[in-house]
């Protein structure tokens, strides 16, 4: 019940920030949020001052530390970039990925090894959905979670002799010294309403962009060239030295989720041709920070998206959620439901069997990121 109330409050605040007040009550709430925004800004300035005056010093490790972060709250497409860089850099280096493990049981001060590069050592509830998904896709690359990234980096160096550490969501994490800061900018909603949390979606003032070495504008294929240039011009106002890349995602595979007959001891991933999506009527389901991008990728792949069900980011699926999805599919006479890799790792064998029992195909759309820039980003990082 508490979780439901929290989700409703979160949804109300997000809609209020995006759409503006509609009542006196809304105006009062925004006034309170504005006061909290000023307090938050003061805390950011104080924290930055402590580090600038060397009163607090970041920890250092021998490995090169590459941070992939953002300046706004919510999904900006960091995870596909982390996977892309990890695969590229692992071709020539010993790479370890470190993440906080948001909403995981291991989200604590002490680091936890999710994957040693050969085996996944935890389950999805302990690792968190994004980290567990990365572990399934990054064979050969260890993953560590922990809120204290310095401790996690030391573990990466000690246990895996890491040469490169990729810090997932590390732009505002000052405890660990970085060699490279990559900042993702969401092409669909780049600058968080221009206001700080909780009045807007900015994690820190836009002046913080001057710390970036590289900018990657995600979902560049979903916006016009004029809008893209506007974003680049704004970035240039705060940082003229950072190199800007455009990131696009493309659907690269389709998987059907099934279960072994009788004992159902394992989940089966059957590869399907992407062509099956062309003209297919589907229901799209996801719990992402920015679901619009997923729906657009489906449409670009040729699917006819009849209905969408969007849950909160990092949503923990319950039996009634699956009942809702199945009932909607039956009402619309749709026999294909498509979700994301991030969501699929939270589906149990019993959950998947529910779809099979109702003759509904459950598919996962796999995407990969491509970068457009003057030089290959991974090659540049290798030279740091």
From Swiss-Prot:
Reaction catalysed by this enzyme: a lipid A disaccharide + ATP = a lipid IVA + ADP + H(+)
Pathway per its UniProt entry is: Glycolipid biosynthesis; lipid IV(A) biosynthesis; lipid IV(A) from (3R)-3-hydroxytetradecanoyl-[acyl-carrier-protein] and UDP-N-acetyl-alpha-D-glucosamine: step 6/6
SUPFAM superfamilies from the UniProt entry: P-loop containing nucleoside triphosphate hydrolases
One Pfam family this chain carries?
Answer: LpxK
This entry's Enzyme Commission designation comes to 2.7.1.130
Per the similarity annotation, which family is this?
Belongs to the LpxK family.
| Record-given protein name | Tetraacyldisaccharide 4'-kinase
- Source organism per entry reads Halothermothrix orenii (strain H 168 / OCM 544 / DSM 9562)
